Design a protein with these regions (language model features):
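Fe(II)/2-oxoglutarate oxygenase catalytic core
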Residues: 1-101, 105-140, 146-180
Length: 180
Protein backbone atom coordinates (compact mmCIF):
# COMPACT_ATOMS: atom_id res chain seq x y z
CA UNK A 1 0.00 0.00 0.00
CA UNK A 2 2.83 2.44 0.82
CA UNK A 3 4.57 1.70 -2.49
CA UNK A 4 1.32 2.31 -4.38
CA UNK A 5 0.70 5.55 -2.51
CA UNK A 6 4.20 6.83 -3.30
CA UNK A 7 3.91 5.89 -6.98
CA UNK A 8 0.51 7.63 -7.14
CA UNK A 9 2.05 10.80 -5.68
CA UNK A 10 4.93 10.63 -8.17
CA UNK A 11 2.58 10.10 -11.13
CA UNK A 12 0.56 13.18 -10.10
CA UNK A 13 3.59 15.46 -9.53
CA UNK A 14 2.75 15.63 -5.82
CA UNK A 15 6.34 15.15 -4.62
CA UNK A 16 8.72 17.97 -3.71
CA UNK A 17 12.33 18.12 -4.85
CA UNK A 18 14.50 17.17 -1.89
CA UNK A 19 17.05 19.65 -0.67
CA UNK A 20 19.88 19.83 1.81
CA UNK A 21 20.07 21.90 4.98
CA UNK A 22 17.25 23.35 7.05
CA UNK A 23 15.55 26.69 7.43
CA UNK A 24 17.38 29.53 5.71
CA UNK A 25 20.22 27.14 4.82
CA UNK A 26 17.88 24.89 2.78
CA UNK A 27 19.11 24.50 -0.81
CA UNK A 28 18.14 22.44 -3.85
CA UNK A 29 21.37 20.80 -5.06
CA UNK A 30 20.83 18.15 -7.76
CA UNK A 31 24.60 17.59 -7.80
CA UNK A 32 24.31 16.31 -4.20
CA UNK A 33 20.81 14.85 -3.96
CA UNK A 34 18.36 13.82 -6.68
CA UNK A 35 15.29 12.39 -4.96
CA UNK A 36 11.80 13.83 -4.51
CA UNK A 37 9.91 13.55 -1.21
CA UNK A 38 6.53 13.75 0.51
CA UNK A 39 6.32 13.99 4.31
CA UNK A 40 4.20 11.34 6.01
CA UNK A 41 1.30 12.82 7.95
CA UNK A 42 -1.03 9.90 8.77
CA UNK A 43 -3.26 10.83 5.79
CA UNK A 44 -3.80 7.19 4.81
CA UNK A 45 -4.34 3.91 6.62
CA UNK A 46 -0.97 2.65 5.32
CA UNK A 47 0.84 5.72 6.68
CA UNK A 48 -0.91 5.39 10.05
CA UNK A 49 0.08 1.71 10.26
CA UNK A 50 3.73 2.51 9.42
CA UNK A 51 3.92 5.45 11.85
CA UNK A 52 2.28 3.37 14.60
CA UNK A 53 4.96 0.68 14.07
CA UNK A 54 7.64 3.37 14.36
CA UNK A 55 6.02 4.63 17.59
CA UNK A 56 6.31 1.09 18.98
CA UNK A 57 9.97 0.95 17.92
CA UNK A 58 10.51 4.34 19.60
CA UNK A 59 9.04 3.02 22.87
CA UNK A 60 11.27 -0.06 22.67
CA UNK A 61 14.41 1.99 21.96
CA UNK A 62 13.64 4.37 24.83
CA UNK A 63 12.92 1.51 27.22
CA UNK A 64 16.02 -0.50 26.29
CA UNK A 65 18.55 2.26 25.63
CA UNK A 66 17.22 5.32 27.53
CA UNK A 67 17.57 7.52 24.44
CA UNK A 68 14.91 10.10 25.29
CA UNK A 69 13.42 9.96 21.80
CA UNK A 70 10.28 12.07 21.66
CA UNK A 71 9.28 12.28 18.01
CA UNK A 72 9.53 10.50 14.68
CA UNK A 73 9.44 12.30 11.34
CA UNK A 74 9.51 10.54 7.98
CA UNK A 75 9.04 11.08 4.28
CA UNK A 76 8.54 9.04 1.16
CA UNK A 77 11.60 9.21 -1.09
CA UNK A 78 11.42 8.58 -4.83
CA UNK A 79 14.72 8.30 -6.70
CA UNK A 80 14.26 8.38 -10.48
CA UNK A 81 16.74 6.43 -12.62
CA UNK A 82 20.15 8.11 -12.35
CA UNK A 83 19.46 9.79 -9.00
CA UNK A 84 21.78 9.51 -5.99
CA UNK A 85 22.53 11.17 -2.65
CA UNK A 86 26.17 11.91 -1.89
CA UNK A 87 27.81 10.83 1.36
CA UNK A 88 26.40 12.68 4.36
CA UNK A 89 25.31 12.54 7.99
CA UNK A 90 21.64 12.92 8.93
CA UNK A 91 22.32 15.29 11.82
CA UNK A 92 24.89 18.01 12.24
CA UNK A 93 27.51 17.02 14.79
CA UNK A 94 26.78 18.46 18.22
CA UNK A 95 23.13 19.24 17.42
CA UNK A 96 21.81 15.85 18.61
CA UNK A 97 18.31 16.52 17.29
CA UNK A 98 18.11 13.53 14.95
CA UNK A 99 19.36 10.53 16.90
CA UNK A 100 18.37 7.37 14.99
CA UNK A 101 17.86 7.25 11.22
CA UNK A 102 15.63 4.67 9.56
CA UNK A 103 15.16 3.61 5.96
CA UNK A 104 12.38 1.26 4.93
CA UNK A 105 12.57 0.08 1.33
CA UNK A 106 9.41 -0.26 -0.78
CA UNK A 107 10.48 -1.39 -4.28
CA UNK A 108 9.63 -5.08 -4.85
CA UNK A 109 11.84 -7.47 -6.83
CA UNK A 110 14.88 -5.19 -6.93
CA UNK A 111 17.35 -6.58 -9.50
CA UNK A 112 20.99 -7.22 -8.57
CA UNK A 113 22.13 -4.70 -11.19
CA UNK A 114 19.59 -2.01 -10.18
CA UNK A 115 22.09 0.15 -8.29
CA UNK A 116 20.70 2.52 -5.65
CA UNK A 117 22.29 0.73 -2.70
CA UNK A 118 22.81 2.63 0.54
CA UNK A 119 26.49 2.45 1.45
CA UNK A 120 27.37 2.75 5.14
CA UNK A 121 30.87 3.94 6.07
CA UNK A 122 33.00 3.50 9.18
CA UNK A 123 32.63 6.68 11.28
CA UNK A 124 36.27 6.38 12.42
CA UNK A 125 37.56 5.80 8.88
CA UNK A 126 35.06 7.40 6.45
CA UNK A 127 36.82 5.97 3.39
CA UNK A 128 36.12 2.41 4.64
CA UNK A 129 32.83 0.90 3.49
CA UNK A 130 31.28 -1.36 6.13
CA UNK A 131 27.95 -2.32 4.55
CA UNK A 132 25.78 -2.05 1.45
CA UNK A 133 22.02 -2.19 1.83
CA UNK A 134 20.14 -3.39 -1.25
CA UNK A 135 16.91 -1.36 -1.69
CA UNK A 136 14.59 -4.38 -1.76
CA UNK A 137 11.04 -4.11 -0.40
CA UNK A 138 10.85 -5.30 3.20
CA UNK A 139 14.43 -4.32 4.08
CA UNK A 140 14.69 -1.93 7.03
CA UNK A 141 17.89 -0.18 8.14
CA UNK A 142 18.49 1.71 11.40
CA UNK A 143 21.66 3.65 12.33
CA UNK A 144 22.96 6.58 14.39
CA UNK A 145 22.11 9.85 12.64
CA UNK A 146 24.97 11.99 13.92
CA UNK A 147 27.88 9.58 13.49
CA UNK A 148 27.25 7.17 10.59
CA UNK A 149 28.23 8.50 7.15
CA UNK A 150 26.23 6.99 4.32
CA UNK A 151 25.23 7.61 0.71
CA UNK A 152 22.81 6.36 -1.93
CA UNK A 153 24.58 5.14 -5.05
CA UNK A 154 23.18 6.12 -8.47
CA UNK A 155 20.14 4.03 -9.25
CA UNK A 156 19.48 2.50 -12.65
CA UNK A 157 15.74 2.12 -11.97
CA UNK A 158 13.22 4.14 -9.98
CA UNK A 159 13.81 3.43 -6.27
CA UNK A 160 11.31 4.02 -3.47
CA UNK A 161 11.68 4.15 0.29
CA UNK A 162 10.64 5.84 3.50
CA UNK A 163 13.40 7.76 5.27
CA UNK A 164 12.78 8.69 8.89
CA UNK A 165 14.41 10.03 12.02
CA UNK A 166 13.77 9.53 15.69
CA UNK A 167 14.37 12.88 17.31
CA UNK A 168 15.33 14.19 20.69
CA UNK A 169 14.27 17.70 21.60
CA UNK A 170 17.30 19.95 21.20
CA UNK A 171 17.42 23.49 22.50
CA UNK A 172 19.18 25.99 20.25
CA UNK A 173 20.00 29.17 22.12
CA UNK A 174 17.03 28.64 24.40
CA UNK A 175 14.68 27.91 21.48
CA UNK A 176 13.33 24.42 20.86
CA UNK A 177 14.51 22.89 17.59
CA UNK A 178 11.36 21.99 15.63
CA UNK A 179 10.96 18.99 13.36
CA UNK A 180 11.75 19.30 9.64
Amino acid sequence: ALQGELLHLAAHDALDEAGIGRGQQHLLRKDIRGDAIHWLDRESEAQRHYLDAMAELQRSLNQALFLGLFEYEAHFAHYPAGAFYQRHLDSFRGRANRVISTVGYLTPDWPADGGGEMVIYDPDNPSREVARVVPEAGTFACFLSETIPHEVLPTRLPRTSIAGWFRRNASLGGVLDPAR
